[in-house]
């Protein structure tokens, strides 16, 4: 596989909502779209399971994930980096 193919994969930024599984995190990604008739911005969200090899991401962190080959029945992404750590109050 060439380096160009690896870099053309989707990179998504989202927030970790679950880190309860071993080496797996659940990331929620929110997007906004305008309603076709009324023009109001509507928020859509989707959850992705991502592979976290070192278990470094925690709940509430902002992370970047990249598309990869299927790692399990539901995992299609892997963790690239933790952009921002969660603030614990």
UniProtKB/Swiss-Prot annotation:
Q: Which Pfam families match?
A: Ribosomal_S17
GO terms under biological process: translation
Listed SUPFAM superfamilies: Nucleic acid-binding proteins (SSF50249)
Mind telling me which InterPro entries this protein's record contains? Answer: NA-bd_OB-fold, Ribosomal_uS17, Ribosomal_uS17_bact/chlr, Ribosomal_uS17_CS
Tell me the GO molecular function terms.
rRNA binding; structural constituent of ribosome
Key word rRNA-binding present in the record? yes
Listed A to Z, the keywords are: Ribonucleoprotein, Ribosomal protein, RNA-binding, rRNA-binding
Q: Which GO terms describe its cellular component?
A: cytosolic small ribosomal subunit
Spell out the disulfide connections: none
Report the domain of life of the source organism.
Bacteria
Kinase keyword on record: no
NCBIfam families per record: PRK05610.1 (NF004123), uS17_bact (TIGR03635)
Q: How is the subunit organization of this protein annotated in UniProt?
A: Part of the 30S ribosomal subunit.
Hey, which family's this protein in? Belongs to the universal ribosomal protein uS17 family.
Biological role stated in the UniProt entry: One of the primary rRNA binding proteins, it binds specifically to the 5'-end of 16S ribosomal RNA.
Official protein name in the record:
Small ribosomal subunit protein uS17
- The primary gene name is rpsQ
